[in-house]
Each structure stands twice: as structure tokens, then as C-alpha cells.
Amino acid sequence: LFRSQVAEVAISFDKPYPYEEVRKMLPSNVNLVWLYVYSETVNEAEGPSGTLPYGFQLSMDDHNEIFDPENDKQHFFETLEKSPLFADNQEGQKFIQQNKNKKVEKLPIWGVMLTGQTKNFKALQNEPFVRGASIGVTAPIVPYIQPEK
């Protein structure tokens, strides 16, 4: 993984962490692009059960910086409330009611999607908060496209 490439990497945490803490836990030289906040798995610490994780993408500005996570969160919860998948889902409805009015900084984050140069992910190796990681798309770094992080 630590060759001259860029990658997207999904990280699952050992427990939920507030967004404000997640921001401090992650290296500054990777891009935080998606927050995993809910799944139908009762005890996430036991590992994936094949259920889909629910979360939302973070909007980025022209400098690849997160610029309006509150709006992103609000749109996510509005979409969940309208989803037929959540209409009869008691646990899902409970999650919505407990979290939709929280500020992003206080949301329980179970995992994240990150992008960046593969060498920058090395800082996450052996971190106790990382329960698991999954490498998604990778691409070689080429001279005519410079990664921002």
C-alpha cells in the first residue's frame, strides 16, 4: 500500500467517536471525505454483518477543505427521514430522533472514508482506534496530476 499511489481507504473505529475527536485522531495529510454514522448492526464492535453502513459525504471547497458539515448532516437526516427503508425500522427511527438535532461535532462516528497519498496512511497503522480498514480505489501518482494531500 505504501507505494507512490493515491487511494481511498475506509476506516472502521473500535467504538463511536464524536466528529470533533475524529478530526484530531486523523493525520492532517489525508482527506476526510465521508462519515459513517449508522448501520443496522446491533454491536458494531463485533464486526461487519453484511449490512450497509449509512453516512454522508462532506462537501469540499476549491482547496479540498471541508466547508459546511452542518448542511451535509442536515441533508443526510432529511433523506433518511424520507427513505422507505427507514419507515418501519424502529432502530433507524430511534437513531434519527437521537441524532438529527445534534451538531456535527457531537455525532457518533463509527468510521470514515479517507483519500490521499498511500504513504500518508502509514500513520494510521497500529492505531488502537482502528478496528479495520479496507482499501478501495487506488491509482498511481503521475507527474501531470499532483495530489493535494
Locate predicted features.
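Extracytoplasmic
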Residues: S4-E8, V30-L35, L107-G111, V130
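Short, surface-exposed ligand-recognition loops at beta-strand->loop->(often short) alpha-helix junctions
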Residues: I11-P18
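General structural signal for secondary-structure boundaries
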Residues: P18-E20, Q117
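Short amphipathic alpha-helices in soluble, non-transmembrane regions
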Residues: V22-V30, A123-V130
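Charged, low-complexity helical/coil segments in non-catalytic cytosolic or luminal regions
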Residues: L26, Y36-N99
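Glycine-rich loops and low-complexity Gly/Arg-rich segments
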Residues: W34-S39, V137-I141
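Extracytoplasmic/luminal low-complexity segments enriched in Pro/Gly and acidic/polar residues
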Residues: N89-K149
